[in-house]
From Swiss-Prot:
The lineage of its organism: Bacteria, Pseudomonadati, Pseudomonadota, Gammaproteobacteria, Enterobacterales. InterPro entries: NTF2_fold_dom (IPR028921). It comes from the Bacteria. This is Uncharacterized protein YhhH.
């Protein structure tokens, strides 16, 4: 066998080792993540694991609301309806856009965000 052939074989072997190593690492990481999620869901269903008080104040509620509004209605709508009005309820925050006097038609968004986990409880837009 020629030296050139041996070099090519070594390169192919090295490349294959790298590919297999990456696959094994990626699979193990995915499997561990999937296992962790299963454990968390099991504990949550038993009431042992719950997120509490994640959205502690108005500032966090406003940030989340703006992110959700931008994602759903776009940057322009999020900016046009500022300043936002916020109301604190027992278990949630209600954030609403502001309608400006120069707007003839249309409504504003309203979103209710859970205090414990930041879930969207209600989300809509007036017409």
């Amino acid at each position: 066998m020629s030296a050139e052939f041996m070099v090519i074989c070594k390169k192919i072997l090295f490349r294959n080792c790298v590919i297999v190593s990456l696959f094994v690492f990626t699979y193990n990481t995915w499997a561990q993540c999937n296992n962790n999620i299963k454990i968390m869901r099991k504990y949550e269903s038993e009431g042992k694991y719950t997120v509490r008080n994640l959205v502690k104040n108005k500032a966090i509620a406003l940030e989340l609301a703006e992110i959700y509004v931008k994602n759903r209605y776009g940057q322009d709508a999020a900016e046009e309806e500022k300043p936002y009005e916020i109301t604190e309820l027992t278990t949630s925050w209600v954030v609403e856009g502001t309608i400006h006097s120069d707007q003839i038609a249309g409504g504003v968004f309203i979103i209710e965000i859970g205090k414990n986990d930041g879930r969207i409880l209600n989300f809509g837009h007036g017409k």
